Amino acid sequence: MNAYEGDTLNNHGKSSTRQHWRKRSAVSSSLEFSSYEESNSPIENTEVLKVSEIEAKKRRRKKHRYIYLAVCLFFLASVLSCAIIFRFYLHTNRENFSLFKNDSYKQKEPITVSHFGESIFLPYHQDIEWITSTEGTVLYYDQSTFSLSLFYPDGKEYGSNVDSLITSFVLTCKNLHRKRYSSDMEYIAFSCSKDRRWRHSYYEDVYLVERATGRIEHLASDQSKKIVVAEWSPIGHKLVYGLGSNLFIWESFSEPPVCITDQSDLDGLFNGNSDWVYEEEILQSSKAVWWSPDGNCLSYLSIDDSKVPVHVLPFEQLDSKVEDQNRVNNFFHYSTPKDPIPFVKLFVNCFTDSGESIEVDSSFPLSTQHRYITDVAWAGNEKLMFVEVLRGNYERVTSLFDLSSRKTTIENTEVSEHPLALTSSLHLKYLSFESLGNLKERYVRQYFLSNKKRIAIYELDNPVPIYLTPVNISFLSDLYLINNTLYFTAISSGSPFSRVYRLCTKSLILSEINIQIGSGLFGIKVSNDQNYLLVNYLGPEIPKQFIYSIHEDKVSTSNDHSKNNLPSDSSSTSLGKVKLELCNSLETNEELIITKEKFAFPSVFFKVIKVKNITAYIQEIRPPNFNPRKRYPTVFHLYGAPQSALVTGKYEMDINELMASVYNFLVIKVDIVDISDVSGQHLFSDSHELIIKSWIELLRSYVDTPYIDRHRVGIWGWSFGGYLTLKILENADFIKTGAVVAPVTDWRYYDAYYSENLLGAYSKQTTAIYDKTAVHYSENFRKLCGLLVLHGTSDDNVHIENTMQLTKAMVEKGVYNYYPFIVPNANHEFSDPTDYTFLREKLSGHFHHALYC
């Protein structure tokens, strides 16, 4: 019986010893064969042999199974590993594959560093001014061109073109600053910039052109003297201008100018124009003259800096033969917190009277040496309103001067134990209208409450303000008052973008003017008849300019407060509706739109975040083909000064955009808009440490964003932003590198008005505060992959002493990764094209290297 036949079957008819594979052929040895023959029990020997062979085969099969299983597992593991590696490579390099590429960037040209020096990414902008003809026609003109043309709102030219009258003059005025028509349109004043005075002003050559004849004459009889201020009267063509220390009134070519101050030209005496601190911090303009509405009177400030120390810039003209129009005065009067401040007086001169200037009495007769005059506004033609602030900003008084009685009365007094909210101009505006047969006099100004700028209205006999804007709207800029109607731009809570509003101060109807352009930053100018609105769309998309006609929907409201007392709060304000109709697409920047389609621009993303008690606006400038699954080296850009905004939505192609588009960085602008534990009235004196900690906590939290490479984080700032950057680097340990431009390092080196508004008047009681808020050495500086500091020797705002003191401290501590870079002749803005190009490339290049050190 063969092996198969000898198998036993179980009850199911299946062999209990049957194998599931075929047997191998076996060749027996002679020894095995002889043993088999000699066996007394052949069947028994055969069975033993079978069992032995089966066990051996089982062991071999088991061993083979392990080998096969190991090979299979190894193969599967290899395939899986390759798949994972390929998937990761595909994920991190998806922008290199056409399948995953963003179509909007597919054929676009990459941006290089050199492109930023060619101005091809900059928009065009027209400097439009409204004017009304003698017959009442609303017109406009561009202040930045030589053309004498005037235009209707729809863009059609008004009258005949007379540009040929000034063909030769164009060669005389090589650098036009601006042109201004007289209110009767008979004369044009051309201001030709010659030498820069300070940040906001130039010494100018002013030429007058008679529009009817083309006659051109230089305004100053002594052309060696430069003019700082030249302002037309609101009626007719009187022109006030400042020459040396005196003010003059020009009225016609046939009559000589009249001097209304008649003082000797003295260094440090400013009549009708600002000294340094008034220009930079208070009026934010070189102009310190105000015409009455009828043009018959003029008010002006007289500023005496004779007791204010002279600051000398470490200026070194490398080539005296080269004329530098961006050069500032190399010496000027400048008060720090330890110094006397300017002595200021307010005068009124009415040409219909004796012609003598009348000094306006101060509301602080015993403290005139320690006061600033921050606002001046005419209340009709017979009264003058003005605001005075005591040094340190602990007391602010609004007063009214009556020309007929020559008396000053106090209308409102604000007093605080701490400095009041930091402000320059309050945008003081006078209101008057008939109510129940009586003349109701009021005034409007901005008011700071809970870290927001609100618009408030006051009655002259009531010091309690009424807020005209809701608490969720913070006044921004462009405040126009026309016939008791206010036009302004503001931002609402939860968005960094501006909106345009109109507010009737008589009926208290607040209207949002809906502009069908998109969200972003807006600037406005309103025509004198309120029928036309110039809208400047400033970003984030390509800037544009439009002129609209204004139409109002009639709104039924019982909220007419002209016959009653004012409401207790703006909650009573009604909402009106305003329609706009497009008249003229003034500037669309089509060339820039085409350029943007050609090049791979960075993208911009805005959001609002909250970290514990901190609310902040964020603007991310993302590199082309931004991939949220990747991690990007990141640079934070900060400013952080009180009542300022960095995140505005303005279109820019500058340092941040260079780093994003050329070096593939993520650049993030940050504004903290609210810290619930910090008083909105004051920034530093009580809570400076908490504020710095809040900035650090916010940044530390944000670097955990998935697409930020937390090991490659940098930070930079300019001016106040430079100070904030240094304080963060002093106290934070998670930032790899930093860069600052013109930083404040100690508020005792900065101007008294700003510093004392932050920290209080300098005294024995406040010395500790000034010490604490200064920048101090920290071991965190030593751990950085480089700290770059850029400062110009001709910086009239933040003096180079700030950087010198910081450098001294770093040298004493042996901090070798500190890189100060002093730029000869550069001013605070690095406004010279060569200086700014160097700054842009040096700063961006620093981060390009330092974030990978």
From Swiss-Prot:
The chain crosses the membrane at residues 66-86. Residues 15-25 have a biased composition (Basic residues). It is found in: Vacuole membrane. Residues 1-65 are cytoplasmic. Its EC number is 3.4.14.-. One of its GO terms (cellular component) is fungal-type vacuole membrane. Residues 87-853 are lumenal. This is Putative dipeptidyl aminopeptidase C14C4.15c.
